[in-house]
């Protein structure tokens, strides 16, 4: 499990969302590299109880774009649980879409082929697929949390779709939640602006938070004064503080 010096506010807000104690169901996490976004996404997954389906997607690896997201969600939740979506895919495939064997490799390949058409036809097909996909999600008996990491690494089309279409669909279904993290984050649209909360991860300068972290990870070789020096040296940037602590701990073990 990833240990944190201090992300109490974000974790508490996430738990409130899942319990229905706040109105928001969309959480945007913005921070530069090294501030612990990815580790926080993993912690969000752990906080999901057995009554909630978490779906983690790293958007920087989604080179197939929208097709990858559809396919990834299906793989995590179970392809058979999307009967309407699968039927719509079959209808498109049986309507004359040309499929070459060497193109049917990788996640989302069939969906990619279906969407590999001129813009107007692509828009129509995507609308049809999106509609039945979210209709299938409405039939799930448990809430679903989509955890989308590295939004800044998404293709331009995928980022725009998440911002304008995906999150709008999430807003319509009270059993759906979405966490989107990145160095940049989606801009709220009228469909979901009243259902989102934005968190900007800051540097962690709180001494007590780092003292607790050092104790949790077993770095008993540091005094509080030494920890203070390391925090100030890198101005509380979490990844850099951790790197200094780990490096100093290894050096002391070798002495």
Regions flagged by a language model, labelled:
Residues 3-17:
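N-terminal pre-P-loop "Q-motif" helix
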Residues 183-199:
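Short regulatory helix/loop adjacent to the ATP-binding pocket of P-loop NTPases
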Residues 197, 215, 219-255:
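Amphipathic alpha-helical "lid/sensor" segments that cap RecA-like P-loop NTPase cores
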Residues 197-208:
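Conserved AAA+ ATPase "SRH/arginine-finger" region at the nucleotide-binding site
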